[in-house]
């Protein structure tokens, strides 16, 4: 139940990777047959990704994952367009892979505007409209929030950015495989394999033709100079298989989340859903709930002892002390933040597992409240 942190690699992905390890040992930059064969195979993966998000094959570039893709978009565009302007716009609920580069860019002399969100996690569009101007070079807004599951209005925000001559980037690491990204209007899209039952250490960035971006990793000029370094062939083969299967379980996820939400609400009192219960603006994979009268971290470990794995927020920043910047941004109180748990579902979860999770969570919460330690 912690699939927003990472997902179990699928059997199908593992099988194609094992075959790839056995035969795909050429360097795709080599001019001989071994190199050409491998290059053709990874170009097939490129095409699979392009088809799934509405880009062309030549607009897909491989990276080591979502963090690198986000960094490349932010630093690469800032470097390429610094003469056009020095303003970047993002939101207060972005992943650290966007927020940390933005803070670095501020130190480098760029102005970064952080747009507020409402209690659902939707950016305040009036504030966004007022911030946009002809000096805005890039807007970076995630497709789906990794803590509360809110689907952000990236198509509308991309259109508004383009009206002012700005480029638009979306971190779609949590959205890929969950929402339709074709026609979303983004100039840059970041995706990651390990969030869709693929291998870790593999990702991609889509770069719309004509969008200014400079390489941040220099060397042999692989990926048409956008990202040097010999490609992770076997990982990319696994990525391609994961992309093929990415959207197969979307409806199953929605049904499981609905079952989990309804069960928790009917069985446990004094809970609060963080984000939105509206399925039209919330992904089917993430449910963030505050169980008032408990502490999320202690509840996490209690559930862990029962074989149920959840989280209290983003795994990428959970080792850092401090409250969730996402829950703070949507207006949660201190008690709501400290008692929050994120459940994140995968297509491999079953209705029976959802029911067990509800039962064990109910027992754990009741035990804490009976003790009265946190009231």
Task: Outline where the language-model segments fall.
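Pyridoxal 5′-phosphate
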Residues: 1-375
